[in-house]
């Protein structure tokens, strides 16, 4: 069993935190975020840190308070540093381009895929085969990166498709004659 929830989340200088009921709000140099903690978890802000504890001694409460602590730590990291996911596009003729608030992807289909960039997310295309997804909400950054990857996941034979830059693609050998 993990003991992640026992450590308090320290709030660095330059970040203001407030706890109102079950809602934790963080405001920092990059923006502001909030997270609603489950009712089975107690949340307190004292001595410059946020502490979480299970309200009951149930397995569900034990699991939820570790999750709540990790989510609050992500709020702090998001409003101070932010989050970034890098995607790589591999394949002949596969490329990406920005058109205002839309991402245009040429992924081998008969048409280009147009992806509307959601609010709070910044996408940059340093090269036609690289996409950087940046934002302060880790959930949103991961979701956007996963949605872009899902348009053409990497295939195991040639490795063509959209993949995370740190992802390893298990390659298969083709059929033998």
From Swiss-Prot:
Disulfide bridges in this chain: none
Gene responsible for this protein: rplF
The protein's name in its UniProt record: Large ribosomal subunit protein uL6
Family classification: Belongs to the universal ribosomal protein uL6 family.
Keyword Ubl conjugation on entry: no
InterPro entries membership: Ribosomal_uL6-like (IPR000702), Ribosomal_uL6-like_a/b-dom_sf (IPR036789), Ribosomal_uL6_a/b-dom (IPR020040), Ribosomal_uL6_bac-type (IPR019906), Ribosomal_uL6_CS (IPR002358)
Pfam families for the chain: Ribosomal_L6
GO molecular function: rRNA binding; structural constituent of ribosome
Any GO CC annotation of this UniProt entry: cytosolic large ribosomal subunit
Signal peptide (UniProt feature, chain positions): none
Functional note: This protein binds to the 23S rRNA, and is important in its secondary structure. It is located near the subunit interface in the base of the L7/L12 stalk, and near the tRNA binding site of the peptidyltransferase center.
Self-association state and partner proteins as the record states: Part of the 50S ribosomal subunit.
Organism, scientific name: Rhodopseudomonas palustris (strain HaA2)
Keyword field contains rRNA-binding: yes
Key words, A-Z: Ribonucleoprotein, Ribosomal protein, RNA-binding, rRNA-binding
GO biological process: cytoplasmic translation
